[in-house]
UniProtKB/Swiss-Prot annotation:
PANTHER family: DIAMINOPIMELATE EPIMERASE, DIAMINOPIMELATE EPIMERASE, CHLOROPLASTIC. GO terms for molecular function: diaminopimelate epimerase activity. Belongs to the diaminopimelate epimerase family. This is Diaminopimelate epimerase. PROSITE patterns: DAP_EPIMERASE. Its EC number is 5.1.1.7. Substrate binds at residues 11, 60, 70-71, 181, 199-200, 210-211. The gene is dapF. It comes from Helicobacter pylori (strain J99 / ATCC 700824). The active site is at residues 69, 209. Keywords: Amino-acid biosynthesis, Cytoplasm, Isomerase, Lysine biosynthesis. Homodimer. Pathway: Amino-acid biosynthesis; L-lysine biosynthesis via DAP pathway; DL-2,6-diaminopimelate from LL-2,6-diaminopimelate: step 1/1.
Amino acid sequence: MVFYKYSGSGNDFLITQSFKKKDFSNLAQQVCHRHEGFGADGLVVVLPSKDYDYEWDFYNSDGSKAGMCGNASRCVGLFAYQHAIAPKEHVFLAGKREISIRIEEPNIVESNLGNYQILDTIPNLRCKKFFTNNSVLENIPMFYLINTGVPHLVGFVKNKGLLNSLNTLELRALRHEFNANINIAFIENKETIFLQTYERGVEDFTLACGTGMAAVFIAARLFHNTPKKATLIPKSNEFLELSLKNDGIFYKGVARYIGMSVLGMGVFKNGCF
């Protein structure tokens, strides 16, 4: 079984093809493991589709399925073009979402995430029980729960340096309380936003999270009056341009091919697939 490794904004993914829908959860856990596998934030399985150029099944590194992953959408778009599965401009199905892809040479990929949904606005008081003494999060007056394909909790700090002082245990508690990824961000100016994301399914900070960047972008736009186009800078420092248009949220940034790996037959005998 052949896996192609791609990276987008600091997220890395293993991409493979299958002609049938199967449960790849165990396989995802093994191949995404950083020490015992090839190492990746997630596994993308590209499948044939009657109505679209292709569709995918996406798995987090812990084997859980997710309907959407923003940076993976750009990576799989580049993969599909480079492997003659789809043209430069195409549409694929991610769960129930139609994702449009546009590739600009040599490796700039734009994807349309589609629409978003504001699920809730959460005052600080509802979260205080999860904070430790002198918590960075204490001074965030309001959190925003936003669905950009998967749910994200977003809060803004007033000092960029605080992004490096976040408490993993606090974010993990919030992640389980709201069953969402946790994003803490700083608006440097109206068009530049820094963020850190604690991602469910990875259960730790990640170098980047596309849907998390989208949620932060929307929260900043709606509640902090930022413009319809901004640059988001995650932990990886690989920036992503986000824009809001009539038909949804658009990502635009670099995606790159890293390498290829081949999985031997031993994994099949061990019952991992």
